[in-house]
Swiss-Prot record:
Keywords: Cytoplasm, Lyase, Phenylalanine catabolism, Phenylpropanoid metabolism. This is Phenylalanine ammonia-lyase class 1. This is a key enzyme of plant metabolism catalyzing the first reaction in the biosynthesis from L-phenylalanine of a wide variety of natural products based on the phenylpropane skeleton. It is found in: Cytoplasm. Pathway: Phenylpropanoid metabolism; trans-cinnamate biosynthesis; trans-cinnamate from L-phenylalanine: step 1/1. (E)-cinnamate binds at N50, Q138, R144, N174, K246, E274, N277. One of its GO terms (cellular component) is cytoplasm. Belongs to the PAL/histidase family. The keyword Transport does not apply. The lineage of its organism: Eukaryota, Viridiplantae, Streptophyta, Embryophyta, Tracheophyta.
Length: 506
């Protein structure tokens, strides 16, 4: 087709940018090529139709995207660790140095760089120190072993890139003319096996990257695993009316299945052709085309996952503001109702405040915040339990109405019931209007350029069931931006200070 078009064959057709079918003459005019149609010199026609130019050209485009998506997967794994309150030791230089694999060392170093100094990781460390038993000692595999998982895939993509780089700079026509020896060498440099094999390997690597993203995304939306984030990352006041990212997770499962299907090799399906002259042939263009399909699906997965991470970042911001509001309210109410008795004397219940605030610190905000005073939710149950425990310790004093902590429980709960819902709603309203008392921690992190790109440049926002916008509309904005290459600059900005080496072992 390309050779026919270049030589101006009247029956050759091209498709223009708008989808209109063009003749060769119209295509030349549209491309502003003012010269006549090409007159092919000896061997040039064969080079066009029988060489590896088209396959290697497609492979070059595919591998450019594959390299970008590989780096993006490393950075997204680091952001995943941030929002999941993971333990940063999984990136420790020594662990990966002892394994020797260069791809793994590189992946860990990139994640280590992103997480170094992260406000989220500092907060997570404090959380683990306060209550070491609040979450498992070790993070799950999708987080903890992400450098080991991505490492070999990076090496495969890099090897494939080098292979195609050699191919596009090589001679692949036939025969080759050795002028010095006056020989025509009938060889087979047109055989595109390096392309076919490289594309098969790349496609397998892309499928594995997609599988990791799906595993991480599934953890992110599951409130049994995500360390306090709401189920499906719902952000509405009433989570019962908000499906959140449930549809996105179903889509991710579908993407992952198709990506894994495409990982099947093409080069194992070679058929003999041309009366057994071409009894082996590379199928390089087929493999490159299928890898291009895989690239598109992985872009869909990457955009969905990054939108989920941005949602989680915003929910952590909301969580921090809501927790602060609840904590201040509980503190104020306990001071007013538990400090003194009816006659102004100091009351034994004044010692409860510290333990009451510990409950607020340890309880996941989104487990109760849609109805903070509900007796069926853990906050009120555990606050009451603190007062009951102190009352039991109070022993003999409980017999005196003036020193009884049991007598204070109803007063404390009634005042909290009056004030807490109003304070929570006020905090949420301030957050939604962009006037949150506590700023978003992401601005202090190296992953901020990606978040800023998604939220500010693309104009996306926190997804809630209260809005008319569907999640798919927001995902499409990011997917389109990734396809247009707009994500490259913010991605590289995240790594702008990285010198290509792991942090020193201290």
């Amino acid at each position: 087709y390309i050779a026919g078009l270049l030589t101006g064959r009247p029956n050759s057709k091209a498709v223009g940018p708008s989808g209109v079918v063009l003749t060769a003459k119209q295509a030349f005019e549209l491309a502003n090529i003012n010269s006549e149609f090409y007159e092919l010199q000896p061997k040039e026609g064969l080079a066009l139709v029988n060489g590896t130019a088209v396959g290697s050209g497609m492979a070059s485009i595919v591998l450019f995207d594959a390299n970008i998506l590989a780096v993006l997967s490393e950075v997204l794994s680091a952001i995943f660790a941030e929002v999941m309150q993971g333990k940063p030791e999984f990136t420790d230089h020594l662990t990966h140095k002892l394994k020797h694999h260069p791809g793994q060392i590189e992946a860990a170093a990139i994640m280590e760089h992103i997480l170094d100094g992260s406000s989220y990781m500092k907060d997570a460390k404090k959380l683990h120190e306060i209550d070491p038993l609040q979450k498992p000692k070790q993070d799950r595999y999708a987080l903890r072993t992400s450098p080991q998982w991505l490492g070999p895939l990076i090496e495969v993509i890099r090897f494939s890139t080098k292979s195609i780089e050699r191919e596009i700079n090589s001679v692949n026509d036939n025969p080759l003319i050795d002028v010095s020896r006056n020989k025509a060498l009938h060889g087979g440099n047109f055989q595109g096996t390096p392309i076919g094999v490289s594309m098969d390997n790349t496609r397998l690597a892309l499928a594995s990257i997609g599988k990791l993203m799906f595993a991480q995304f599934s953890e992110l939306v599951n409130d049994f695993y995500n360390n306090g984030l709401p189920s499906n990352l719902t952000a509405s006041r009433n989570p019962s009316l908000d499906y959140g990212f449930k549809g996105a997770e179903i889509a991710m499962a579908s993407y992952c299945s198709e990506l894994q299907y495409l990982a099947n090799p093409v080069t194992s399906h070679v058929q003999s052709a041309e009366q057994h002259n071409q009894d082996v042939n590379s199928l390089d263009l087929i493999s490159a085309r299928k890898t291009n399909e895989s690239i598109e699906i992985l872009k869909l997965m990457s955009s969905t996952f990054l939108m989920g991470l941005c949602q989680a970042i915003d929910l952590r911001h909301l969580e921090e503001n809501l927790k602060s509001s609840v904590k201040n309210t509980v503190s104020q109410v306990s001071k007013r109702t538990l400090t003194t008795g009816g006659n102004g004397e100091l009351h034994p219940s004044r010692f409860c405040e510290k333990d009451l605030l510990k409950v607020v610190d340890r309880e996941y905000v989104f487990s109760y915040i849609d109805d903070p005073y509900s007796g069926t939710y853990p906050l009120m149950q555990k606050l009451r339990q603190v007062l009951v425990d102190h009352a039991l310790i109070n022993a003999e004093n409980e017999k005196d109405v003036n020193t009884s902590i049991f007598q204070k429980i109803a007063t404390f709960e009634e005042e909290l019931k009056t004030i807490l819902p109003k304070e929570v709603e006020s905090t949420r309203a301030a957050y939604e209007s962009g006037k949150a008392a506590i700023p978003n921690k992401i601005k202090e992190c190296r992953s901020y350029p990606l978040y800023k790109f998604v939220r500010e440049e693309l104009g996306t926002g926190l997804l809630t069931g209260e809005k008319v916008k569907s999640p798919g509309e927001e995902f499409d904005k990011l997917f389109t931006a990734i396809c247009q290459g707009k994500i490259i600059d913010p991605l590289l900005e995240c790594l702008g200070e990285w010198n290509g080496a792991p942090l020193p072992i201290c």
